């Protein structure tokens, strides 16, 4: 009951008739977060693309300048020297054939997966397990690579992966509620820049149709996705 009351009170602080500048949205999100734990701050975009068409798929990665606030558990499929290098770089789980079998049976105690190219023939059969969770290694996201050290370091350092879903929505995290507001906005700016860079040439009309920022269990805050400059400014003087 208390949680419901808190949620209603938080929701009442959000003006649904406007789109907030990123800095304002972050401040409001922090203010309306009511969880006892350090919640995650997430952004959702509704994109003007048709993901059923290969030339309108939006998928990529970005290294958030201030990380995500969470140390990802990384699984690496590798053998020999590359397996040893992955372990030395801080990979949490490393293996090959036996590990592939474990994952096929449902082992999912990890947040990211990296594989060397020579093992992808075997890892490929895990598509039904890893695919729906967005964990399938892919050369385009740097997770199928002989350089497992770089891949592990990138992921541990705050690299996030994003992919438009079948409903044309794209979600990504920008940090924790405890983050300084400037760091959250700078993380958002880095992700936004990369997503804009990846706009498919085949996509027509408005690219980002709707944007929302929210914390774990917090209200969704309408975000002005057209704001691509001066993100650390509350509002454009001309629009006040």
Curated annotation (Swiss-Prot):
Gene Ontology CC entries for this record: large ribosomal subunit
Annotated Pfam families: Ribosomal_L1 (PF00687)
SUPFAM superfamilies assigned: Ribosomal protein L1 (SSF56808)
A Gene Ontology biological process term: translation
Segments passing through the bilayer: none
SS bonds (residue pairs): none
Keyword Protein biosynthesis found: no
Keywords, in A-Z order: Repressor, Ribonucleoprotein, Ribosomal protein, RNA-binding, rRNA-binding, Translation regulation, tRNA-binding
Domain of life: Bacteria
Gene Ontology molecular-function annotations: rRNA binding; structural constituent of ribosome; tRNA binding
Similarity comment: family membership: Belongs to the universal ribosomal protein uL1 family.
Alphabetized NCBIfam families for the sequence: rplA_bact
Stated role: Binds directly to 23S rRNA. The L1 stalk is quite mobile in the ribosome, and is involved in E site tRNA release.
Subunit structure: Part of the 50S ribosomal subunit.
Protein name (record): Large ribosomal subunit protein uL1
Organism this protein belongs to: Streptomyces griseus subsp. griseus (strain JCM 4626 / CBS 651.72 / NBRC 13350 / KCC S-0626 / ISP 5235)
Name of encoding gene: rplA
